[in-house]
Amino acid sequence: MDVKRSFLFLQGPHGPFFRKLGEELSRRGALVTRVNLCGGDFLDWPSHSCNYRGRTSDWSEWIGDLMAKKEVTDLLVYGDWRPHHREAVHIARLHGIRVWAFDEGYLRPDWITMEEGGVNGNSTLPNDPESVRSECQDCTCEPGAIQTENPLFKRQLKAWWYGFFSFVGLPFFPFYRTHRPYSHCAELFSGWIPHFFTAKKRMASSEKALRRIGDTPYFLFPLQLDSDSQVRRYSPFSGMKEAIAYIMTSFAQHAPQDTLLVIRNHPLDNGLIRYDRFIRSFSRACGIEERTVFVESGNGREMIRKARAVVLLNSTMGLQALEMGKSVYCVGKAIYAMPGLAENGAQDSLAHFWKSPLAPDAKLLRDFEKVVRCRTLINGNFYFGEGMKLAVQGCADKLLK
């Protein structure tokens, strides 16, 4: 007799996506349990859920008991590296429970990532050309995606509301501490709110900086969120300022004198770190103030198109750059860093890359993206309209397959 599937949801992307996916799985006959850890979680899934208000030191035993009581067969988490998630994942694996990790799409736009076992640094995707080509031969998925609307402002709004409710919910979840390096209170009142009111000025400054570049050849360095696990767990750096210092120093020492370094901020940055001030100060110390350009915004694809090459930690912008035929160097651990695609320290030094960047192998890239789509991607988005509905249906189909 088939065992009835029992899905346990922990924290998901900001907004109702996990709740809607749970409702769809329940409609199809599965058992669904959700655990809220903070006020933001409660906002996203207020009913038919349970709240954990205990200490972090008691979490492992509590979640293990819940898994046994609910006879959980599948654990769903957004990001497998958060402390609460990490402990739950270990317990789930011990008891043979499937782990499904979600994240923004490895390929964008119009895709989300849902990978069994783990994502990013914990991914089991093939990481050498021979394995990629071998697995690609068995892939039968369709290459196209239905385009969906996914406005950046709506994503920011969901993040703001999540942070606000996490802050006001502290009396009800007194022991919860965010996995992020800053509290929700600090992010909201010292970051997002002043960041919002200076947006117009910052955009004007960015437009002026982009005009200054003109036809000068440049290397593009797209920043990632300072709180991103890709930065803090899967790179040699403790945060983005350390990464910026490393890359700027290398650029000053080894890049051709006729090139610029264009540093683009992440569009969802909360504004707590004044990157403009730090980069201005550090560029002066390195003697490259006139060769360094920092922008808060700008069309990412257009900036990639005009760049000589792209240097980054492990952002998915690296895959976009490879798709556009650009050379990419990863300073951190990335799923696409392998011979023939993006370079990294295992293949060559950053010092050499500034002078002689290697173009990607287009056929290998097509094979790799096909494997990624077949193994990990669902068409749609986490946040808005028809794209969310599409992703919910696709995830439910795959989970119950």
Where do the protein language model's features map onto the residues?
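Conserved catalytic-core segment of nucleotide-activated headgroup transferases in glycan assembly
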Residues: 28, 173-278
